[in-house]
Amino acid sequence: MPSLVGSEMCIRDSTKSLFQTRSIPTNDIEMTIAFYEKLGFEIAFRTVNEAADEKVAFLKLGTLVIETYENKAAALKPGAIDHVAIDVKNIEKVHEMITGAGLNTTQDEVHFLPFWENGVRFFTIEGPNKEKVEFSQYL
């Protein structure tokens, strides 16, 4: 499997930061927001993912952003974080690199959600431990 670090098309050159968000499913978004607000987080953005009928909130403390979404199916046990997201500059280029390196094991395509001011484009792959790694670009 080709490496994406040290190659001509380096993924490091395509990212904006190490991690963009950590995503936590919840059964009660208001309780989750209240908990993180007590820890000093502020609501950075709040919306509804109408396609999935889920309330969504992005909570920010410094450079850490937690995305929480109410899906009524949260595991409520350790290991319940759904995915990590990596912020990229050019989603199409990164998708091409990941797919070309044989890392797009889910065969996921680039999707769009109307989050934030202009939306976000993203795709998700699966790591060797079944963890989800999302690559996303704010528009």
Regions found by a protein language model. Name each.
Residues 12-15, 111:
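First exposed extracellular module after export/assembly in secreted or surface-exposed proteins
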Residues 17-21, 79-83, 120:
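Short, solvent-exposed beta-strand edge segments and adjacent coil->beta transition regions
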Residues 7, 22-34, 66-74, 99-103:
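Short N-terminal helix-initiation segments at or just after the protein's N-terminus
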Residues 44-78, 125-126, 131-137:
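Conserved short beta-strand elements that form part of the metal-binding/catalytic scaffold
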Residues 26-30, 84-132:
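Vicinal oxygen chelate
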Residues 2, 34, 57, 96, ...:
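Surface-exposed charge patches
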Residues 1-13:
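Single conserved hydrophobic/aromatic residue that forms the stacking wall/gate
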Residues 16, 23-65, 116:
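Core segments of cupin and vicinal oxygen chelate
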